[in-house]
Amino acid sequence: MGFSSELCSPQGHGAVQQMQEAELRLLEGMRKWMAQRVKSDREYAGLLHHMSLQDGGGRGTGPYSPISQSWAEITSQTEGLSRLLRQHAEDLNSGPLSKLGLLIRERQQLRKTYSEQWQQLQQELTKTHNQDIEKLKSQYRALARDSAQARRKYQEASKDKDRDKAKDKYVRSLWKLFAHHNRYVLGVRAAQLHHHHHHQLMLPGLLQSLQDLHQEMACILKEILQEYLEISSLVQDEVVAIHLEMAAAVARIQPEAEYQGFLRQYGSTPDVPPCVTFDESLLEEGEPLEPGELQLNELTVESVQHTLTSVTDELTVATQTVLSRQEAVAQLQRELQNEEQNTHPRERVQLLAKKQVLQEALQALQVALCSQAKLQAQRELLQAKLEQLGPGEPPPVLLLQDDRHSTSSSEQEREGGRTPTLEILKSHISGIFRPKFSLPPPLQLVPEVQKPLHEQLWYHGALPRAEVAELLTHSGDFLVRESQGKQEYVLSVLWDGQPRHFIIESADNLYRLEGDGFASIPLLVDHLLRSQQPLTKKSGIVLNRAVPKDKWVLNHEDLVLGEQIGRGNFGEVFSGRLRADNTLVAVKSCRETLPPDIKAKFLQEAKILKQYSHPNIVRLIGVCTQKQPIYIVMELVQGGDFLTFLRTEGARLRMKTLLQMVGDAAAGMEYLESKCCIHRDLAARNCLVTEKNVLKISDFGMSREEADGIYAASGGLRQVPVKWTAPEALNYGRYSSESDVWSFGILLWETFSLGASPYPNLSNQQTREFVEKGGRLPCPELCPDAVFRLMEQCWAYEPGQRPSFSAIYQELQSIRKRHR
């Protein structure tokens, strides 16, 4: 099979031309590709050379190490590789690429020559085989007609003269016919031979020579490609040698010995600074105190007990933190072990991030263990000191003994049933240190329409489309949201009972639906709302009412934090302002290190307060839960807590003011009782006082809402304020509004003793035993008899015998009216 036997037809000629065009396109593609390869290799070689220059041949300025030596070898070999690649690029350009260009020119010339020769052969065949023969045949027919006509005239002639003339014409016509016949015979023979030569010799010869040249060019192209591959190959001996040198340099790295040289050069013996000790010079001008020993006397016993409770609570949280972090470390170690078994050694880099997380978790565990150890040591010091005291009374302060001896016996007898004057003294001493705090400066208020989109009440963020219908209730209700996954803003409007959604177009920093553009979406919405212009001419929809987002949700950026004003069980408390309107707020934070279940308890307070609105209940403003740390934002009550207020201002307060303030507390608790809310931690320290001496119930961290008004607690008494808690709650974990009434009785006692601590000389366990035996707190010195009788009713052992908060409030109002 070959061109000469298979491609002689016109269809074969067309196929040959298409094949030549396709091969030329292929060759042109090869030439462009090789030219790009030459360019790329030149650029690559240049980049490698530039990298070597920048790296300085692998010579760093840091300390010597095996890795740096190996890296120097790699960069040096890379420079050699760049020179080799540059030479390869030049060889490609002068060799295969140049030859390929010449081959393309020859192939183009061959295509042109073949086309011209084929056309010439076809033209000659057509002329000889068709045109010339047809012309001879046409002339033959004409001469045959002339001869036949002359013969008829000759045969029909009768006269001699006419006959001779007709004969002469007949003879001439025969001569012409016979001569043309011979020419036709010769023409037919020539055409037959031309036909034979064309189809058997000339056309096959042309095609055969074409095939031979094509095959020769294919052979040349093969040699060009072989040369190209030889030059561009990356497995040449030179390239392989370079890479073997690099591989040897890498193989010389020994991770276990990498830093031995560094340690020999820079290592030194540990220089541990001396541990802190008690500075005895502090005692030179002060009281004769024992260095490093806790002072437990009548002035400090209360603070030591409270500190022990606080440290114990913090130790509980720290222990939970340690356990959670130990579990996290164990989980990470298990995951790493499984992944290392299922990961190829060369994919170990994928595990680095998790290994770093493990190291961070181990470090965090060490920090938690350190915190736990510190708290444990502090608790042991406090416990040992209190156990050393035993059930007896704390030793007196020497400085105050003379004052105590000068007191008359009648006064001592009276003080047996009243609050000791020493307690009032301690109250005033502690009041000297009442914390003062400054507020962050007011912010310049921005008009609502100029606030950014995320601060607009009607902007709901990435609200799912399915939830829009639940928020839009009346025709014309609208909100703006972010389209999920499309980074577009959508205006959603309820119209004719159906939610309609309009994509807000953004172009050239302008926002529009139809018509004019505006510099911001708030400006666009404000214009549509004020002008009542239809959103689109086709829809005719107009905006009527903006649907605000959940009022409790705040962003961390909505707050400006001031200084720390306190500390709770979960974290610090700060003063602050809302950026939107400069509202003063108190911001309670939750430590990031707390376990999730503790954080859930922190948010319990906000969950409770969301439902309440009362002048004597501290007001919730919002929560920030989008990121850490979590905040609960509440109104800022600038007067501080009620306990500190009593200890600092109590001596200057009128009796009516004290009655009014406990009446405020009763009103707040009456409201909570109506909502079936159990506070569980009612005490003076958990009430706040405004600048106008209005009291507000606060600190709902332990509060619970129960439909039947009874809450059964579990988990022990580690965080229970024993001296304020009713017997049934301590014994059985049964909390109710009646148990809050017991705590309110203690609050009354704190109020009229001006901030003294209940059961000052008793531990928590001793207090429980004292109450179970029927013991109760004595009447404070300044307390009206009617109020003390109310206290005693609050301390009835049986919960059902205690008054309700409604009755307590009415009784306090009555006492206040009677009091001058």
Curated annotation (Swiss-Prot):
Chief location category: cytoplasm
Positions of the F-BAR domain: 1-258
Listed SMART domains: FCH (SM00055), SH2 (SM00252), TyrKc (SM00219)
Biased composition (Basic and acidic residues): 401-417
UniProt GO MF annotations: ATP binding; immunoglobulin receptor binding; non-membrane spanning protein tyrosine kinase activity; phosphatidylinositol binding; protein tyrosine kinase activity
Subunit structure as annotated in this protein's UniProt entry: Homooligomer. Interacts with BCR. Interacts (when activated, via coiled coil domain) with TRIM28. Interacts (via SH2 domain) with phosphorylated EZR, MS4A2/FCER1B and HCLS1/HS1. Interacts with phosphorylated KIT. Interacts with FLT3. Interacts (via F-BAR domain) with soluble tubulin. Interacts (via SH2 domain) with microtubules.
Family: Belongs to the protein kinase superfamily. Tyr protein kinase family. Fes/fps subfamily.
Superkingdom field: Eukaryota
Modified residues (Phosphoserine): 65, 406, 409, 714
InterPro entries according to UniProt: AH/BAR_dom_sf (IPR027267), F_BAR (IPR031160), FCH_dom (IPR001060), Fes/Fps/Fer_SH2 (IPR035849), Kinase-like_dom_sf (IPR011009), Non-receptor_tyrosine_kinases (IPR050198), Prot_kinase_dom (IPR000719), Protein_kinase_ATP_BS (IPR017441)
Membrane topology (UniProt): Peripheral membrane protein
Region (Important for interaction with membranes containing phosphoinositides): 1-298
Protein name: Tyrosine-protein kinase Fes/Fps
Residues that hold ATP according to the record: 565-573, 588
Domain Protein kinase, first and last residues per copy: 559-820
Species for this entry: Felis catus
Positions of the UniProt region annotated as Disordered: 392-418
Modification note: Autophosphorylated on Tyr-711 in response to FGF2. Phosphorylated by LYN in response to FCER1 activation. Phosphorylated by HCK.
Compartment(s) of residence: Cytoplasm, Cytosol; Cytoplasm, Cytoskeleton; Cell membrane; Cytoplasmic vesicle
